Design a protein with these regions (language model features):
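Short, flexible loop segments at the rims of nucleotide/cofactor-binding pockets, characterized by
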Residues: 25-31, 48-51, 126, 177-184, ...
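Short gly/pro/ser/thr-enriched loop/turn and capping motifs at secondary-structure boundaries
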Residues: 78-81, 101-104, 178
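Rossmann-like dinucleotide/phosphate-binding beta-alpha-beta segment
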Residues: 135-224
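Phosphate-binding beta-alpha-beta segment of Rossmann-like dinucleotide-binding domains, i.e.
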Residues: 90-92, 98-146, 158-161, 165
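A general structural signal for well-ordered alpha-helical segments in protein cores
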Residues: 13, 57, 61, 106, ...
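An N-terminal-biased, well-structured beta-alpha scaffold segment characteristic
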Residues: 2-93, 216
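Conserved small/polar residues in nucleotide/adenosyl-binding loops
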Residues: 229-231
């Protein structure tokens, strides 16, 4: 099965080549981003493997389908950049990455919170210049602070577990409450209440029509001033 990977980097070539060894896949790597202009490069490829910055709107999908493509394989969990209705009309199947380490994303979110709270980037730059003063670098203890988790799927739950380990109080917002968070003592609130009460807010939700512009200027104004500064 001839497969073309758009927006491919050297690490894509290494990992995909190794994973496809011994299979019936014939992999081809294209560093260019998929657009209406580059879609012609997929002529004769049954499978197009795309990344998050590739264009997969109706005109691009139509050109891919005309060139013989039958499957769009996403190298991402998110699919908000794909016109699914157009894909269905054209008979194009679309698959995505069903899961990846929720711990990696959750841990990265916590690392960013710690870095912002303790001004690590500013402190690093200062010490490189021989300035070891603490002015403007002190943050606050996470212990005892209220953390709002917006989206409590696998990643949000992993994030909540870490913050509970810091001794934080948990608030949550999700249409489907997660029993694991309830067991951690989290309180599910309406989003406006969460925004007002939480000192730190972390978003762990996909981009859909329901979540688009979930955070607006109006919702930012509802947050605590310190929370808006650090998250």
């Amino acid at each position: 099965m001839r497969t073309l990977l758009f927006s491919s980097q050297h690490y894509d070539q290494e990992s995909f080549t190794q994973a496809a060894r011994g299979s019936a896949l014939e992999l081809h790597f294209q560093p260019a981003r998929l657009t209406l202009d580059t879609a012609a490069l997929a002529q004769g490829f049954e499978v197009v493997c795309a990344f998050i910055n590739d264009e997969l709107d109706a005109p691009v999908l139509q050109r891919l389908a005309a060139g013989g493509t039958r499957l769009i394989a996403l190298r991402s969990a998110g699919y908000n950049h794909v016109d699914l209705a157009a894909a269905a009309r054209l008979g194009l199947a679309v698959v995505r990455v069903p899961a990846y380490s929720p711990h990696a994303v959750a841990e990265h979110a916590v690392a960013l919170i710690l870095a912002l709270n303790r001004r690590l980037h500013r402190a690093y730059n200062r010490t490189r210049e021989g300035d070891f003063t603490l002015h403007g670098l002190t943050g606050f203890d996470l212990h005892g602070k209220t953390v709002g988790v917006v989206g409590t799927g696998q990643i949000g739950a992993a994030f909540a577990r870490i913050m509970a380990g810091f001794g934080c109080q948990l608030l949550a917002f999700d249409p489907y409450p997660n029993p694991e968070l309830l067991a951690l003592g989290a309180r599910y609130l309406a989003l406006p209440e969460l925004l007002r009460e939480a000192r730190i807010i972390s978003l762990h939700c996909p981009l859909t029509e329901h979540t688009r512009h979930l955070i607006t200027a109006q919702s930012l104004a509802q947050m605590q001033q310190i929370g808006r500064a650090h998250v």
